[in-house]
Each structure stands twice: as C-alpha cells, then as structure tokens.
Amino acid sequence: MSWQTYVDDHLMCDIDGHRLTAAAIIGHDGSVWAQSSSFPQFKSDEVAAIMKDFDEPGSLAPTGLHLGSTKYMVIQGEPGAVIRGKKGSGGITVKKTSQALIIGIYDEPLTPGQCNMIVERLGDYLLEQGM
C-alpha cells in the first residue's frame, strides 16, 4: 500500500460526514512521504522543533507548535509519543512512529478526540509494523 493511500483512506476518512482538514505522513528528516492536497506548506525547522519536543517533552510549550503559517498552543499529549495542539475551534495531533510523524489537522465540527483517534490509530498500526 502506498503512503498516499494511508493518507487518503485512513487519515482523511469520513467520520459522521466530517473529516480532517489536512493530514500528512512526514519522515523524521522533514521529507514528505504523503500528504493531503490541503496540507500546509511547512518549513524544515518546524519539523525539527516538533522532533525536539519528542526528545525533550515540553520544549514546544513556551513557543507553541508552528506548522505552516499557523501557531498552535501545545496541550496535554503523551511525552515522546504524541503532541497535541489547539488553535481556536481546531487543532493538530502529531503521532511519532519509529520512522515518521503522522499529522492530522482538524476544525469543528470534528472534535479533538476524533482527530486523536484517527491519527493515533494509524500511528499505532505503523509502529506495530515496525515503521
């Protein structure tokens, strides 16, 4: 299965008639493996800052998580495994696997819990597959 299929079928899936705003699978080095057409253009230093927070949990809290032109307030996650961010009525979930970052961006009416479930379910599956 291609990485794009994981994005299209698993991350951008339909939940009660709603879906994520954008999603991507990005390598730890910042390379894009696959992304939805709506995924924001991001900078490599933004991915580096996300990776640093997985190694040093809490490092993003003072500055926020930046992706594209959007700043998210970092909220509770799972140190070393999941980073969650909030901005207005939407937010972001980032799940780290051994080789990639699974990223989902949402806005109402999708809930934070639904975004977490979508992103973390795929991330957990990829971890089980050794990825």
Swiss-Prot record:
Segments forming a coiled coil: none
Keyword Cytoplasm: yes
Annotated localization: Cytoplasm, Cytoskeleton
Keyword field: Actin-binding, Allergen, Cytoplasm, Cytoskeleton
UniProt xrefs under CDD domains: PROF
Pfam family name, one: Profilin
Record GO cellular component, one term: cytoskeleton
Subunit composition and interactions: Occurs in many kinds of cells as a complex with monomeric actin in a 1:1 ratio.
Protein name stated in the entry: Profilin-4
Organism: Hevea brasiliensis (Para rubber tree)
